[in-house]
């Protein structure tokens, strides 16, 4: 099995010899900035992580829908464990940035959840951040995590947020 850097550098989508540069971020994948023929791309290499509810085919399907409604950059190339998208020069928003930009961010999220859902094609899995919270809480509980005493309180907060969000149209 190839290492992620080697995998990223030998993809058939490149028209020239490329030298991927590691990009920080990605909890379950390796990210690289790749320049090919004067264009920059982001290459993500990572296998499915079922324990974290990360299934790459689902990410790619949802990504294509997001691309179709103008929310994300264009997907250039995919394989089961690889995603190459156009690079957007910018910065990752931190909590303070999100707070400041919330009035601009929320309409984009709403747009994707309305128009993006109609753009989905093929099989997809549902995603609920609240389900993820419950899943992780059970994993931490079963592992006798140091966070175990906090889990009930955290799940109560998550349930309050889920109630505030209300039913999600799919």
What are these regions (language model features)?
Residues 115, 163-169:
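Protein kinase catalytic-loop region centered on the HRD/HxD motif
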Residues 7, 108, 135-139, 154-164:
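Residues that form generic nucleotide/phosphate-binding pockets
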Residues 1-19:
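Juxta-kinase regulatory segment immediately upstream of eukaryotic protein kinase catalytic domains
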Residues 2-4, 76, 140-141, 167-170:
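Short intrinsically disordered, low-complexity coil segments enriched in acidic
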Residues 1-3, 149-156:
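A generic alpha-helix signature
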Residues 21-142, 146-150:
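ATP-binding pocket architecture of kinase catalytic cores
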Residues 12-18, 58, 154-164:
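Short Pro/Gly-enriched beta-strand edge/turn motifs at strand-loop
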